[in-house]
Amino acid sequence: MSKLRFRVVESAFEKKATEIATMAERPSKYYGELVFNREKMFKYLPEKAYERLVDSIDNGSPLDRETANAVASGMKKWAMEKGATHYTHWFHPLTEGTAEKHDAFIEHDGKGGVLEEFEGKLLIQQEPDASSFPNGGIRNTFEARGYSAWDPSSPAFIVGDTLCIPTIFIAYTGESLDYKAPLLKALEAVNKAAVDVCHYFNPDVKKVYAYLGWEQEYFLVDEGLYAARPDLLMTGRTLMGHESSKNQQLEDHYFGAIPTRVMEFMKDLEVEALRLGIPVKTRHNEVAPNQFELAPIFEECNLANDHNLLIMALMRKISRKHGFRVLLHEKPFKGVNGSGKHNNWSLGTDTGILLMGPGKTPEDNLRFVTFVVNVLKAVYTHNALLKASISSATNAHRLGANEAPPAIISSFLGTQLSKVLEHLENSDTEDFNLAGKQGMKLDIARIPELLIDNTDRNRTSPFAFTGNRFEFRAVGSSANCAAAMLVLNAAVADQLRQFKAEVDAKIATGKDKFAAIIEVIRKDIKECKAIHFDGNGYSEEWKAEAARRGLDCETSVPLIFDAYLKDSSVRMFESTGVMTRKELEARNEVKWEMYTKKIQIEARVLGDLTMNHIIPMATKYQSSLIDNVYKMRELFPADKAAHLSSKNMEIIEDIANRTIFIKEKVDEMVNARKIANKIESEREKAIAYHDQIVPMMEAIRYHIDKLELVVDDQIWTLPKYRELLFIR
């Protein structure tokens, strides 16, 4: 096995970049060529069917069977012209990935042959086995029926030879078994609530869109090195490994020159993404060695989420073509930054106004403050629930580790906005002349005046206002954005409804509309003041202060999930029509079960590696030292031999003590798992794994990492951090 390590290291050094030919056309020419977008709809659909489909997409109007058949026929024709032979309903089960089953475009022709067929009923609905996906007990094997149903708002696309049709996934009894269905409901809820509030300022607003711009961080590791690390292969992260002498302390990787092999991967990925209509815009080195980031232009939230899931699948596929494996785990390497997926979220109207962007008139700025304060109130009211939405066994390694936002939800606003809210809270005057941008003269030749945002950036804040949007930074790199987005949009929708009810009640008593709005805003600012924090979220002082403010400070992931079932959460979800108590209970069962299984797999892999690699390596090196000590005694007088071999004796004893501890702790961990596995309650089982198994794994790792420092490098079988992080 040690020979394998050195072979893959040598092979990785010798690999050349797989050059990607530059596309002859500009990106705008091939953008969306594999997407059944409105341009394709107009070309391939009858006029009446096109108009009805567009109306369904824009306004949610139902589609009749005749229109569905026409759409299916046009979609099939376009897809087959592009080389597609199969179709699939593409959905997002509660596994955090995607699912698909491919069927060919063929049916019997009644004459012993086949013909290509795709009817509206196949487009609209299919019946996957719901019991085979995480469902929290909603579906059993003996009652397995589930339905996938077409989502017309997200266009179909082609991957390889398959037409992929975005769908929701529900149980036979109607409960959602995916992320897309509740996300769509949350987006509709925030649309209705925001439109109602917008009418205070502009009665022409008919629709409000939630926008999402995600920033996908990831690591790339040479596939040979990846294959030689069973922990990476099985869990997505290194369960052991001492920090490299050099990691990110020189701060020389962030925004540095992109390595050649990596650049060719990025170019290949971008071309495929653009062909699939994903508007990728930014690529750069991240803070940690071999860590990178990809970000698109923001899009409507549902479509943006589909595109993020699609881009993660593309990254896994294309990285292998370039001899890499992409790591989307939140913390694949100890001691260097983990990976997140910042979710830039905003609301905008069909009249072209970003609701969280300052305006030019006092009325515009009152609208701006109205929506910002309502978002803050929603985040304050449901801060525990928002934390639950981004919590997982994998993200727990990253949050609060002085590299990512802490596991306490707070909001950074910046100096200017903070002063505006403070002024509004404490004074009777209403001056809303707030600048959107302010100039900065740098006094450097040939550098023009910069327009700077009216907020600074606070990297320690999990939910920061950044000029015209909020940046939810606590989302993990492997997560489905919908988990966080459905909670955020539903919470904001619920708060906007409450706000409107309070304002309307004051107007009904004869109070002026704007005076009523300001009065309710002032009250809400005072009530949600605890969520506002512009300081250092990494500090111990903030943890104590957050507890004093009544913010949720729980750090145990299984207990964090309890927030979904709080009375306030259930009321919010049910009143907005996003999810029922039964659906929430089922999802929590899935969350606890997934947490347990991920820790369970890691513990089993760690135990196997310990017994099959670590202890044999350590004892082999120990034996060579013992042999050396015996030879010293044969060669030198006793006193001199004892002196010359004293350091080796210390190492021999150190190895013995550590291997004994590791073996005993692994045995203890195995027994603890057996006991935990017998617990029937998924919640209690997850708590047992968190409280008992995780600390044992950390203790085992500590001693393994110490052994790595003393065991002969030629004997060590597993690629080390310096190889995993610095070979590109």
Show the residue positions of the predicted features.
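Eukaryotic, polar/proline-rich low-complexity intrinsically disordered regions
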Residues: S2, R7-A12, E33-E39, T98, ...
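N-terminal hydrophobic targeting/anchoring segments and the immediately downstream early-domain regions
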Residues: S2-A24, T141-F157
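Flexible inter-domain linker/hinge segments
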Residues: V8-E10, E19-V35, E188, K192, ...
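Active-site core of metal-dependent hydrolases
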Residues: Y30-E143
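Active-site-proximal loop/turn and secondary-structure-junction residues that shape catalytic pockets
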Residues: T67-V71, F91-P93, K121-L122, F169, ...
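Short linear, low-complexity motifs centered on an aromatic residue
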Residues: E96-G112, S131, R229, G236-T238, ...
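Glycine-rich, acidic/polar active-site loops that bind/position phosphate-bearing ligands
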Residues: E143-L328, N337-G340, L347-E589
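C-terminal amphipathic alpha-helical interaction region
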Residues: I521-R728
